Amino acid sequence: MRSLFTLLISLTLLLALQTQGFANPLIAKDKRSSALNFELDDLDKNLIRLSDYAGKIVIVTFWATWCAPCKQEIPHLEKLYESYKDQGVVVFAISTDSPQTQSQVPRIARKWIIPTLLDTEGRVVSQMNPRGVAPYTVIIDRNGKNAFEHDGYSVGDEVKIKEALVKLLEEK
């Protein structure tokens, strides 16, 4: 009896793990909400408008200088950008740093190939990431709709983000 129970538990776990890889990480098209049409300055004081990227897939990650997982996630987002930029993928890192730590943002972010935007007043983070989670990653589809959202970062999360991006690239 005990071996039957062990077998059933093992099969259940195996099925759960197998189906997890096939799950669609995207928000269903009919459930997607419009992304906030934000306007923020980059590190060089250039105004960046989300509306200027209409028709592209935009990955936005909210990060902070004090957030170790944020800094672990960024290299993976840079790799995605490098791999898919020719297919209309754009990546932005939006700093959620408070005025006390904003001076540290350029020192860290200038090493990255993806643009860092400054949300100095917290307007964008309060609307797109109201819980203030860091990192918090959103993928906006070509129609300007939020298609994927992810809280935090752990090793392996980059696979989920890439899966979502690939599925969006396949959408017509």
Q: For each predicted feature, which ranges?
A:
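Conserved redox-active cysteine motifs that mediate thiol-disulfide chemistry
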Residues: 54, 62-79
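Active-site acidic short loop of glycosyltransferases
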Residues: 54-56, 86, 114
